[in-house]
Amino acid sequence: MATGSTAYTWLDDALETIQRAHWHRHPQIITQGPGPEIKLEGQRLVNFASNDYLGLASHPHLKTAAIKAIAEWGTGSTGSRLLSGHRQLHQDLEQAIARWKGTEAALVFSSGYLANLGTITALVGKRDLILADEYNHSSLKRGAQLSGAKVINYDHGCPEVLTDLLMKHRDNHRRCLILSDGVFSMDGDLCPLPQLVAIAEEFQSMLLVDDAHGTGTMGKMGTGCREHFQLPVGDWIQVGTLSKALGSLGGYVAGSASLIDFLRNRAATWIYTTGLSPADTAAALAAIQLIQREPERIVQLQLNVDYLATGLESLTKLNFRRSPINSPILWVGAANPAMALEMAKHLREQGIFAPAIRPPTVPHSRIRFSVMATHSPGHIDQLLEVLDHYYPN
């Protein structure tokens, strides 16, 4: 539909370009969920598009905690955390995150995206340097752009290139911040964290790792990439989300007491927004407690990932490349966006919900499968059978 004012007619042209490139997206209403099975427009589908990796978003303990918090504190925090929006629940959650992550302190934001934006823009500015993995999440990229620092992307997962860039540019800048996903959200691979930590120390650089997809999924206790690599707690900055494996909403930064105190005074996306709602805060706290009591949920997730990855490997026509880590993100490629859309359509017709992932989100189109601990072997077998019959030689 055309816009009324000529000042806005470019929007229609832009949308037409997006449509021609097969990049157009729109939300679809889920009428039943969350869980491994959902209903979409009346159709029952096996859900391979959720980031509810441990199946906690519908867990009774989280629901009970959220309801209790609403009964006691209401539906909203009613102010910014530095004014009237700080509750004991927030402090309890931050202390629980810090203990879980092994850091001195933590700070909870309204989303993981805002945690990255606020932290990056608080730590660096025009006189500084950012070196970022080229496959980083949008929130890291946008935070780097907004900071005003000089931004250089390094080849994905390549510490050698990162080292070369630091040798060339580090001495020309006041501060340096290295940015990387922990588990990369579209590829499911893991950053070379031990090398990144060593490089950051060598070049007197800060290191921020976004562990959004590693929190709750990596390590025996689900504490993330640091536990996976069995690294000691260092000065580097751990960022993540409460909305994936923890089944709630919000984001966090975990690190030294000085870092967290500084962010309370300088992170605009924390200072100038209403605090996380009591329900979301209580649900996230309940999730951490549940994971610590029942680490077998992580074991079940890993078993499901292994089962699907083994099945995809057996379908040789997929040319599936198995990751050396059992991350819950797996994918198969498509030649172009149109083919990815066609594949997703066929999967849906056969009872599988796995939407197409296309540019500009990723450079190469694909179907991404997000594995949950609550998937049954039957759910995974159904997906493998559909792929076996559809995927062209």
UniProtKB/Swiss-Prot annotation:
List of residues binding substrate: R25, H137, T361
Catalytic activity, as annotated: 6-carboxyhexanoyl-[ACP] + L-alanine + H(+) = (8S)-8-amino-7-oxononanoate + holo-[ACP] + CO2
Entry keyword annotation includes Transferase: yes
Gene Ontology BP annotations: biotin biosynthetic process
N6-(pyridoxal phosphate)lysine: residues carrying this PTM: K244
Pathway: Cofactor biosynthesis; biotin biosynthesis
Cofactor: pyridoxal 5'-phosphate
Pfam families listed in its UniProt record: Aminotran_1_2 (PF00155)
EC number: 2.3.1.47
Gene3D superfamilies given in the database record: Aspartate Aminotransferase, domain 1 (3.90.1150.10), Type I PLP-dependent aspartate aminotransferase-like (Major domain) (3.40.640.10)
Keywords noted in UniProt: Biotin biosynthesis, Pyridoxal phosphate, Transferase
Cell cycle found in the keyword field: no
InterPro entries, per database record: Aminotrans_II_pyridoxalP_BS, Aminotransferase_I/II_large, AON_synthase_class-II, AONS_Archaea/Proteobacteria, PyrdxlP-dep_Trfase, PyrdxlP-dep_Trfase_major, PyrdxlP-dep_Trfase_small
Disulfide bond residue pairs: none
MF term (GO), any: pyridoxal phosphate binding
Positions that bind pyridoxal 5'-phosphate: G112, Y113, S185, D210, D211, A212, H213, T241, L242, S243, K244
Entry's family note: Belongs to the class-II pyridoxal-phosphate-dependent aminotransferase family. BioF subfamily.
Function text: Catalyzes the decarboxylative condensation of pimeloyl-[acyl-carrier protein] and L-alanine to produce 8-amino-7-oxononanoate (AON), [acyl-carrier protein], and carbon dioxide.
Subunit structure: Homodimer.
Protein name, entry field: Putative 8-amino-7-oxononanoate synthase
Biological source species: Synechocystis sp. (strain ATCC 27184 / PCC 6803 / Kazusa)
Gene of this entry: bioF
